[in-house]
């Protein structure tokens, strides 16, 4: 029997205009994360990671990207939240959990959810720990 692929569900989030990057990260890390993670675990989230973007590096890199890939855009989001699940139903279950709603009660003070983007798919690893893997031989 083929092994089921784990689904990767990612969300790009932006802080609300007027909220400093420092205050946003402080709130996210020290207030929101401790409230969210236990509820995620309860709702079968297999793995959760946060990708914090660096606006200074992103802005500088955009000028380099423009030279080699005109039209490509370096994301301006503040956070990319990465969730791994066996079934997207677990994401839906999480979103309907009253504890989840309670954890997110202040999110509109801090985040501009009108700019959020969702990505759904699978990870396939081709280099891990410096070693090539999963590449068909010629």
Swiss-Prot record:
E.C. no: 1.-.-.-
Gene3D superfamilies associated with the record: 3.30.70.100
The name this protein goes by in its record: Dehydratase iacD
Single GO term (MF): monooxygenase activity
Observed phenotype of the null mutant: Reduces slightly the production of iso-A82775C.
Induction: Expression is co-regulated with the other genes from the iso-A82775C biosynthesis cluster and probably controlled by the cluster-specific transcription factors iacI and iacK.
UniProt similarity note: Belongs to the tpcK family.
UniProt gene name: iacD
Enzyme class of the recorded protein, top EC level: oxidoreductase
Keywords: Monooxygenase, Oxidoreductase
UniProt keyword Chaperone, yes or no: no
């Amino acid at each position: 029997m083929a092994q089921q692929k784990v689904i990767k569900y990612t969300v790009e989030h932006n802080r609300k205009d007027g909220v400093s990057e420092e205050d946003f990260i402080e709130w996210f890390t020290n207030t929101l994360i401790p409230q969210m993670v236990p509820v995620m675990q309860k709702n079968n989230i297999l793995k959760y990671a946060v990708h914090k973007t660096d606006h200074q590096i992103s802005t500088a890199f955009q000028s380099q990207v423009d030279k080699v890939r005109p039209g490509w855009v370096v994301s301006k989001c503040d956070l990319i939240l990465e969730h791994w699940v066996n079934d997207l139903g677990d994401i839906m279950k999480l979103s309907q959990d009253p504890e989840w709603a309670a954890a997110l009660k202040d999110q509109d003070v801090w985040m501009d959810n009108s700019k959020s983007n969702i990505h759904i798919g699978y990870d396939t690893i081709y280099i891990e720990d410096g070693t090539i893997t999963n590449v068909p031989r010629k």
